């Protein structure tokens, strides 16, 4: 518990000032988080740190974060060449790297970096947008955990995450309505309360799907945590699994409503 608390305090001391500063500071922060998450995923997938794959994946992420500074044609060409280079590693390693592994890495590269880029874009909207997203996820996770402990009887996904219950999931999502009401009354994110509640419930549910997706990935590769980069908390992918999926979802919903 002591290690967990110390890690959380240090992480907040580093993360919060960069979040408040926003701009290029937070852009670099979210990109760095994406690279660290990909480091964890590469290690899970290949059982070692494949520097070539990690580097190529990180370059794809950089192109996404710098897309406004690079011409579209050049960007598409570079991404295409990088994907070809990833596929070429199958031949260069004598088929030690499998096609399915490269396919997974290509998909997850997009999944991770789009998620973190959307988190950066939310900060560009306002600090309130990021605070809203993080608090929605935190409320959902916390109340789903305690609600499941108290009332959980039916497994949500027994083969992927046997400790999660349907009751806990529902309680977690319903608890997020508190965040909807709070941010409707204190910010200009939402035009009316009903929209705030609808968006928040959807974000809450999508965040839980993000958690299950990460759990499925870890179960596939038989690991408990994505890494030990955050002692007591696991890895970056462990901490941001819900955010990665819910950030793009929130941007889409805000454009719809």
Question: What residue ranges belong to the model's regions?
Answer:
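Membrane-embedded alpha-helical bundles of polytopic integral membrane proteins
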Residues: 1-165, 169-201
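Acidic (Asp/Glu-rich) catalytic motifs at the cytosolic membrane interface
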Residues: 35-45, 137-153, 166, 205-245
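Hydrophobic residues in alpha-helical membrane-spanning segments
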Residues: 18, 232, 247-249
């Amino acid at each position: 518990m002591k290690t967990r608390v110390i890690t959380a305090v240090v992480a907040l001391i580093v993360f919060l000032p960069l979040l408040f500063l926003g701009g290029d500071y937070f852009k670099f922060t979210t990109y760095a988080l994406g690279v660290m998450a990909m480091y964890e995923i590469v290690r899970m997938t290949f059982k070692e740190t494949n520097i070539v794959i990690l580097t190529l994946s990180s370059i794809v992420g950089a192109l996404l974060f710098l897309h406004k500074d690079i011409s579209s044609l050049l960007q598409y060409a570079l991404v295409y060449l990088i994907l070809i280079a990833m596929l070429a590693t199958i031949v260069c390693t004598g088929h030690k790297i499998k096609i399915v592994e490269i396919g997974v890495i290509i998909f997850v590269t997009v999944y991770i970096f789009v998620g973190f880029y959307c988190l950066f874009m939310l900060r560009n909207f306002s600090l309130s947008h990021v605070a809203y997203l993080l608090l929605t996820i935190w409320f959902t996770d916390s109340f789903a955990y305690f609600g499941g402990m108290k009332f959980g009887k039916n497994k949500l996904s027994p083969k992927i995450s046997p400790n999660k219950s349907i009751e806990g999931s529902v309680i977690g999502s319903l608890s997020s309505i508190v965040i909807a009401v709070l941010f409707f009354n204190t910010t200009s994110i939402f035009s009316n309360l009903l929209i705030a509640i609808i968006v928040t419930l959807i974000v809450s549910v999508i965040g839980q799907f993000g958690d299950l997706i990460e759990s499925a990935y870890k179960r596939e590769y038989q690991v408990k945590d994505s890494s030990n980069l955050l002692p007591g908390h696991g890895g970056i992918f462990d901490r941001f699994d819900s955010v990665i999926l819910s950030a793009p979802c929130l941007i889409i919903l805000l454009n719809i409503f």
